[in-house]
Amino acid sequence: RLKSSWLYSFLRKPIPVRTWIKVKMPTFAFSDKEVADLTAYFEAMSPGAEYEASVHVGKDNAIAQKGAAMVTYMDCGRCHDDGDKGIEFSLASQRLRQDWIPKWLKNTRAMIPWTTMPSHWVKDGDNYKVPTKYDEIKTIGDVDTQVNTIKDLIVAYNTAELDFDASLGEEGGDDEGGSDDEGDDEDEDE
């Protein structure tokens, strides 16, 4: 799930990733060759991990902006903005492989059962569906489009100009199907 370039940098100089965990990665006095060998080892142990040639290709800013509106609507920043409970988006952008992000978003608890991150899409047989609580994200498209939109946001997070005050459903819409009362009160006060 990690980019080799990020892993190499991390092994050279560890930084806090999960700030809410009290255990810290020790700093070893690895030589450049040892770090390269360790990175190559982890890469070899990751089946199907290939160099992401497209990692430096810019993402469509409009799609990344839809992702920003989605994570604002879903209140992802409650955990990810300052890294208190979830990894900051700016760090996720640097360390996570693009192909891994949609798998993680759809299968969060199946992939890592002990994670504190909730599963936002409900598995229904072989398909995923949007829970009523987040009904408004259906305006983005089907579940695959939704998770890929968030993936594009994460990948572009450190390079795109994003407005996290933008909202979903600009075309108007009803709150039927799951907006919580807090969101309704905010709309009435505006």
What are these regions (language model features)?
Residues 1-46, 83-155:
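Extracytoplasmic electron-transfer domains, predominantly the class I c-type cytochrome c fold
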Residues 45-72, 162-165, 176:
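Electrostatic cytochrome c docking/interface patches
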Residues 48-60, 77-90:
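Conserved N-terminal glycine/acidic-rich loop preference
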Residues 56-59, 122-125, 167-173:
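Short amphipathic alpha-helical linker/capping segments at the junctions of internal repeats
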Residues 59-82, 142-146, 190:
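Sequence/structural segment immediately N-terminal to covalent heme-attachment motifs in c-type
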Residues 142, 157-160, 164:
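A C-terminal cap/extension of S-adenosyl-L-methionine-dependent methyltransferases
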Residues 162-168, 185-187:
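Extracytoplasmic entry segments of secretory-pathway proteins
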Residues 174-190:
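Long, acidic low-complexity intrinsically disordered regions
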